A protein has these predicted regions:
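Predominantly cytoplasmic-facing regulatory/coupling regions of multi-pass membrane proteins
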Residues: 1-87, 152, 157-274, 315-337
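Alpha-helical transmembrane segments and their lipid-water interface positions
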Residues: 54, 62, 66, 93-97, ...
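Membrane-interface alpha-helices at helix entry/exit sites of multi-pass transporters
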Residues: 79-82, 99-101, 114-135, 300-311
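Alpha-helical transmembrane segments of multi-pass membrane proteins
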Residues: 85-93, 129-141, 231, 307-316
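Short intracellular "coupling" helices and adjacent cytoplasmic loop segments at the cytosolic face
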Residues: 87-102, 109-117, 216
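Transmembrane alpha-helix interface/packing and boundary motifs in multi-pass membrane proteins
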Residues: 91-97, 266-287
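Re-entrant/interfacial helical elements at transmembrane boundaries that shape
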Residues: 101-112, 279-296
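C-terminal transmembrane helix pair
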Residues: 277-278, 289-337
Length: 337
């Protein structure tokens, strides 16, 4: 008997929750809790609070940048709409990995203006296209920053990053899977294009794909393109400062006292890479990757590295939850009035 879609989604979510639990367990089992609590007492909490405030600010800036991609389709899209969409997205992702993106798209489409025929100016397919171009752009920026870090600070980070990428690239299964996905997508697009004029389901599917293409091309129809790049630079500058704030918060602890702004930049990149693993809220994946990097580069024990990883990750989880709650209250009570 085949499972229905709801059951499959529940089982998929439970699987990734289990993965997160296992990752957290392996990270936490080596923690010296007496040392951990002592570190919390020595922590400069004003920097942690500053990092959380910067986290809320980056949601607003990201929302403004995404709004630039949406405006060619719906000029009425407001900053508060994209800000709320990002906040709700982050909060939903804490519970169900990747579901936040669906919530984000549904939110902006639901708040889109209507044309004279009563249809939404912004449709789901076009919104999805803008989300994809945003993700691709951020991925390219991350790769570019990692490459710059390797070139400029090879002695410190180069060997670790190259070794990590070499280990990833040596997996034949990964390359076969990637090639298979590309071939499948190409074949699917060719079939949809070939049968598009027959109407029915093929016409609808091709229409949806064409809408995604329109969303992807929204970059070329933006006004003030330079502002998009300014927003991007500001976003990553804020992320860097957030990482630096946690480094500064732990300066009174000997294991972290030598860390610099360059080290905070590396930890920011390492943390962004962990988001590829679709566990709820990044639990476990972030902790494991950051602790492993600290052990390899600075010989900081995993149990000690967990102090930084936990403080950085959980402070941002709290920020996401609070921002999501604030947007929910705004949407449910203030905006509807």
């Amino acid at each position: 008997m085949l499972m229905d879609k709801k059951t499959k989604n529940i089982l998929r979510s439970l699987f990734w929750v289990a993965v997160a639990v296992v990752l957290v367990y392996f990270c936490l089992r080596s923690v010296d809790w007496e040392q951990f609590m002592l570190a919390m007492e020595q922590c400069r909490w004003e920097y942690v609070i500053l990092s959380m405030l910067l986290g809320a600010l980056v949601f607003y800036v990201r929302g403004n940048r995404w709004r630039m991609l949406l405006l060619p389709f719906d000029p009425s899209t407001s900053r508060i709409t994209t800000f709320n969409a990002y906040n709700i997205c982050m909060a939903v992702n804490l519970a169900i990995p990747r579901a936040g993106e669906v919530a984000r798209l549904g939110y902006v489409v639901g708040h889109s203006a209507l044309d004279k025929d009563g249809r939404r100016l912004l449709t789901l397919d076009k919104a999805l296209g803008t989300l994809l171009i945003e993700r691709v752009w951020d991925g390219l920026v991350t790769i570019g920053m990692a490459a710059a870090l390797v070139v400029l600070m090879w002695e410190t980070f180069g060997a670790y990053l190259v070794e990590s990428m070499a280990g990833l690239g040596s997996s034949n299964a990964l390359w076969w899977a990637l090639g298979g996905v590309i071939v499948f997508i190409g074949a699917f697009l060719w079939v949809c294009y070939s049968f598009r004029e027959r109407g029915g389901i093929w016409g609808k599917v091709w229409g949806f794909i064409a809408g995604i293409g329109s969303g992807l091309s929204s970059f070329m129809h933006m006004k003030r393109v330079w502002l998009f790049f300014v927003y991007t630079a500001l976003i990553w500058l804020i992320y860097w400062l957030m990482s630096a704030c946690i480094v500064w918060a732990l300066q009174d602890i000997e294991a972290f006292s030598h860390l610099t702004l360059a080290d905070a930049f590396f930890l920011m990149i390492a943390g962004s890479i962990s988001s590829v693993v679709p566990v709820p809220g990044g639990f476990g994946a972030y902790h494991g990757l950051v602790c492993g990097a600290m052990l390899s580069i600075w010989n900081i024990p995993v149990g000690t590295g967990m102090i930084f990883a936990t403080l950085n990750h959980e402070s941002q989880v709290l920020t996401q939850a609070l921002c999501g709650l604030a947007s929910y209250i705004h949407e449910s009570f203030i905006r509807r009035k």
